[in-house]
Amino acid sequence: MKIQEVKRILTRWQPSSFTLYREVFAQYGGSINMHPDIVDYFMKRHNWHFKFFHYEEDDKIKGAYFICNDQNIGILTRRTFPLSSDEILIPMAPDLRCFLPDRTNRLSALHQPQIRNAIWKLTRKKQNCLVKEAFSSKFEKTRRNEYQRFLKKGGSVKSVADCSSDELTHIFIELFRSRFGNTSSCYPADNLANFFSQLHHLLFGHILYIEGIPCAFDIVLKSESQMNVYFDVSNGAIKNECRPLSPGSILMWLNISRARNYCQERQKKLLFSIGILKP
């Protein structure tokens, strides 16, 4: 028996199944890189290998996680697919207190009350940034003024739900090239198109246009459970010529505002990740 298998036995994590993992995720939620639809996509479309584990207490399943390709907790492929690897939020009951037998340096700080053997100063040298419950009145006023100025200059807004996968792929690649030029590589076009096509239902948010031409697009993915909704901005791009109109700030504000309304209507907790805080 391998050492890792012994650790899982000692910490009460049992071998599980994808079906059970999906059920636990639907109840407790987690980060996008732990979402069962994402797992299913990489299992079926890319033949990736996953091992699932669950934690049972008082005849109830209180948590579950997986190991991807015998390497990591979570799906960490941010350079080739639009998936953030900034943090791992594992589906767990709020009252669960346990030891996690597998290592990760991306564990969400939200797990501090739950996972007893994590050394947080080592586990998270850089913290992921989650938006506040509400913006200040000054911030809201500034964004509203920017938005009105944007509209007066010929700006418009369109939901990503109203765009085809091919449209989204073309828009993002064009804006990415405008923003970064040759200084940074975009995702492979085939990967992006296939990902958008198969997981279109997880996309959330808006695209901004100036006089009918796309000028800002953040890839926001939504992970919803019975308890919460986790939104993650995996990447974003803007048209350089439009920077004076602050399209990036406006788009982020619109997407967060829409996410807040979405959660309030469903009486669920909002978790909106915008990435690692820079030191």
Cite the ranges covered by each PLM segment.
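A conserved beta-strand-loop-helix scaffold within acyl/acetyltransferase catalytic domains
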Residues: 2-59, 66-72, 133-243
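Acyl-donor-binding surface of acyltransferase catalytic domains
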Residues: 60-62, 67-160
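Conserved acetyl-CoA-binding loop-helix of GNAT-fold acetyltransferases
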Residues: 94-97, 244-259
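Conserved GNAT acetyl-CoA-binding A-motif
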Residues: 98, 259-276
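Generic recognition of stable, solvent-exposed alpha-helical segments in well-folded globular domains
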Residues: 145, 167, 247-250, 254, ...
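Short regulatory "switch" loops immediately downstream of catalytic or recognition motifs
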Residues: 222-223, 255-263
